[in-house]
Amino acid sequence: MTAFSGESLARNKYTFFAAKARADGFEQIANLFLETADDERAHAEIWFNYLGAAGKTEDNLTSAAAGEHYEWAEMYDAFAKAAREEGFDDIAVKFELVGKIESEHEKRFNKLLKNVKDNEVFRSGTAAMWVCGNCGHIHIGEAAPENCPVCGKPRAYFAIKAENY
């Protein structure tokens, strides 16, 4: 777990370093940070797989929801209280705001878990616009097609079209 955590931390750190290098006008350095970050992701995946940490999607959604619940209900709440006690009110507010985001993440994962359990991931119950994530084909119906009639990708590539613009 330590190797996985270390590689994961390094990946994020190098990604942030890349953004700073790019902002400072160092494209080559930014690209090398990103290349190294991707290497670190690959290393993290090796250790993650050895840990057997990725189960079935239902199990992963349950784990993700539990992790998000812990973050908003315990971790960020405790961090906010400690920051406030130490006089860092601005940081306490950030912890509370991030906690609210984590609560929304938990809701999202629980909704997705319910959809998987109820076999509703690719069904809407009413006519909907399903978009192929590979080629953009639009299918109108209560369920996504088994395969895209344009590019042949399986149902897994379809999602209900989000028109939030």
Model-derived regions, located:
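Non-heme di-metal
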Residues: M1-Y165
